[in-house]
Amino acid sequence: MVHGTVIGSVVGSTPLQQRSNPAPQPRNLRPPEQDLPRSLNYYADYSGCGFWRMIWPEHAMNAYGKMVQIGSTVMTRDPNVYNGIKSIRLQRQASPHQLKFLEWLRTQADQRGFRLIYEIDDVMFREDIPEYNKFRFAFEADEVRAASQRMIEMCDEVTVTCNYMKEYYGHKTGNSNITVIPNYPPKWWLGHMYDEQLIMKNYDRHVKKRRKPRILYAGSGAHFDVDNKANQQDDFAHVRDVILKTVKDFQWVFVGAYPLPLQNLVKSGKIEFHPWAKLYDLPELIKSLKVNAMVAPLIDNTFNRCKSDIKFVESSALGVPIVCQDMVTYENALNKFTTGEEMIDQLKDLLRDKTTYMKHCRKANMAIQNRWLETPSNLDKYLELYTLPYGHPNRKLLNRLNRL
């Protein structure tokens, strides 16, 4: 009461506690997430693949109320952590001490009824990692080769990014429970980057007026023989000469790294170079460079056939046409080449006039509209993965994608 008046009453009315029809009280105060399925993720790192394959899907699953997921790089041996979970997904574990942890997890999984899923988005067996790859050293030791294979064999399921990698690991390890889930970019990260007016403005400025189109390659140093271990036989070995010959025709732009034989042109400013950006800043960096097209060369080897088409996805989201190596890696790409000369011909063809160019831009952007992570059918693939065993009839989306 306040000054003799019951709180909630007004003059001439019945106090709240005396009303004959009190407001119904909620019967279930359980938070909605309490009844959702739960799973755990163990990341390999916090670099690009950690986000593409683990962190971004985990964030989306939690944000859209599909399930409750927790992720970490810290291995936990407290058995109570694993009560009531559906599955654990482990990314690119390879060392002997990680094998010991997985052996312990295997016993917990068998006792508690959860599944172990191994995630890998690259070739990590040393015999198929190219000599020019600067990260090869991390997988050269005998114990790493043995531990990584053993862990894949021990898991109930393996997830990869493409069909070629599915066949590769199935052949190498004997584990046939391998599921392809492509790389799905978050729409909040890339979906707002398409700007048709800016694309046309960049064409008018650099192609029509200055007659020197800006051509971009954005990628890590893993594609280049930075330590000169392979006599410069890297992913640009077959296109280097045409880049050298066309520095007056195109403004070549490299982000992240560049082939060592082009170093003098980079130092002189004839080839433009920009350091790598943080992952969340990468789309803005590429957009700020005002490029007219992109390229994605690869040499044909097992390692590259197992690669995913991230460069095609990123460029298409921005509406920048990309010319990709004609390999299984880029089977979805719209413009493909085999030799360096073909790469130049493809660039000239798509840039030849504004009408043709804009058709390429729009077609590229439309080609990836079904690839957004937040698309219900894409997000539900992850839900099926974490909650249902391999080949289960209710995994309709994954079974269709993997032709099971």
Predicted segments with their positions:
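Membrane-proximal helix-turn-helix segments that form the acceptor-binding/catalytic region
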Residues: T107-Q108, A138-V158
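A charged, aromatic-enriched C-terminal amphipathic alpha-helix characteristic of glycosyltransferases
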Residues: L198, T355-K396
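N-terminal pre-catalytic "stem/leader" segment of glycosyltransferase-like enzymes
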Residues: V2-S95
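Conserved catalytic-core segment of nucleotide-activated headgroup transferases in glycan assembly
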Residues: Y42-W56, A60, N183-S288
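A short, active-site helix/loop in glycosyltransferases that binds the activated sugar's phosphate group
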Residues: Q149-I178, P185-H192, P259-P261, N332, ...
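Acceptor-binding helix/loop patch of EC 2.4 sugar-transfer enzymes
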Residues: Y118-R145, K187-Y203, K208-R211, S220-A222, ...
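Nucleotide-sugar-dependent
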Residues: R126, V226-D234, Y280, E284-A317, ...
